[in-house]
Regions:
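Extracellular/periplasmic catalytic domains that process cell-envelope and extracellular macromolecules
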Residues: 12-15, 43, 60-64, 90-92, ...
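Helical hinge/lid and interdomain linker segments adjacent to catalytic or ligand-binding clefts
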Residues: 11, 20-22, 27-105
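His-enriched metal-coordination microenvironments in redox/metal-binding proteins
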Residues: 26-28, 100, 125, 179, ...
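Hydrophobic/aromatic beta-strand patches that form the interior of the parallel beta-sheet core
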Residues: 20, 97, 171, 197-199
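Catalytic beta-strand/loop cores that center a nucleophilic Ser/Cys/Thr
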Residues: 124-196
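Extracellular ligand-binding/catalytic regions of CAZymes and related secreted enzymes
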Residues: 4-17, 44, 177-181, 191-227
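Oxidoreductase and adenylate-handling cofactor-binding alpha/beta cores
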Residues: 113-119, 150-155, 159-166, 212-227
Length: 227
């Protein structure tokens, strides 16, 4: 007999500012770090948090939340339903944090995502290892409580702004040891209708367990949620 059709169940929300974590895909332990660990950090800060790897659930739930944290790189997220939902979400003024894998050029059939929402993207990164993040604009709310520079063991993404896309404001950068150039690590996508924060860090526990990373994540969520 064929397997029963999977129904996309609605998520249950507790009172408070609602944060939807959207993950799933390849090359990362999404459940351990982007779900369980980041959820623990955000719940401890008083947020109502849910995580999904289901593009259909995410498309439906975006209408119910204050901020989304998008780390997914799975192909299912280029569905028309999710594209439309995310576009409406940002156009309505709701906040968006784009995290590590979400800043890749993941969806070849959805160029508008990188151009308009992410302001650019990455197609490569240094080998996993230690590097230094340097703060450029320490007075910005995204960098509240963050050291002027700190070391992290992570993937240094070669994120590059799209010259034809939504402009970005770089708040922190890192210099690659494996190719020429400085690359944005923390930035704002200057979308005309909402607040979008970009955080290229976060490959695994070496980042997610780091106090500086956790502070950046909390800052990104608070700023995009206008809290």
């Amino acid at each position: 007999a064929p397997a029963p059709e999977k129904k996309s169940a609605a998520l249950e929300w507790k009172p408070g500012t609602k944060i939807l974590l959207i993950g799933g895909g390849s090359s990362h332990d999404y459940q351990k770090w982007f779900n369980e660990y980041d959820t623990k950090v955000l719940v401890a800060a008083g947020y109502s948090v849910n995580y999904t790897e289901d593009a259909a659930v995410a498309a439906k739930e975006l209408a119910n939340v204050d901020t989304a944290v998008l780390s997914a790189n799975h192909g299912s997220f280029s569905s028309i339903a999710f594209r439309d939902s995310l576009t409406k979400f940002v156009d309505s003024g709701k906040g968006l944090v784009i995290l590590h894998p979400g800043l890749w050029y993941n969806w070849g059939d959805w160029a508008e995502y990188n151009k308009t929402i992410a302001g650019g993207g990455s197609r490569g990164h240094d080998r996993f290892g230690e590097f230094k993040v340097n703060i450029i604009k320490p007075d910005h709310p995204l960098l509240k409580g963050v050291n002027s520079s700190f070391s992290i063991t992570d993937e240094l993404y070669y994120y590059q702004p799209d010259p034809a896309g939504t402009p970005i404001e770089i708040l922190a950068s890192a210099t690659s040891t494996q190719r020429a150039g400085d690359y944005p690590q923390v930035f704002v996508v200057k979308h005309p209708k909402t607040r979008i924060a970009g955080l290229t860090l976060g490959h695994d526990g070496k980042a997610h367990e780091l106090a500086q990373y956790q502070q950046l994540l909390l800052n990104c969520v608070a700023w995009t949620a206008k809290k």
